[in-house]
C-alpha cells in the first residue's frame, strides 16, 4: 500500500499505527505545511509506534514559499532528516519563488545530491563540469 497523500501526523494514534503495522506499506507520506506548527513530538511518536524502519518509506511533504522563510524551510528539512524521515520539498507559486527556495527544492528532491552533500550550504547548484556555470 502506498499513501501518496500527505497524512496529518497529529492524527496518528497507537490504534491507527497498529493498523498501519498490519498492512504492507510501500511508502507513507505526511505533510508539514505550516512552519509555525511544532510537529517534532508527533514525528517522534510515529517512529516509536511504527514498524516502518526504512527512512525512504517515511516521506514528508514540506510546503515552502507559503508564508515561510528560507530559514524555516531549511529547518524543517534538516529536522526531518535528523529524525529519520525523507523530506520532499514542494514550492507554492514556484515561478515567483525566490531563487534560494528553488535551489533548496533541487537539493532536497534530488536524493543522490541530498544524501551525498550533507548540508545545503555546501550545495552549489551553479557548479557545472568543474567550473562555475555562467547564467
Task: Label each region the model flagged.
Residues 1-46, 55-66, 86-90:
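Core AdoMet radical
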Residues 51, 63-135:
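Auxiliary Fe-S-binding modules of radical SAM enzymes
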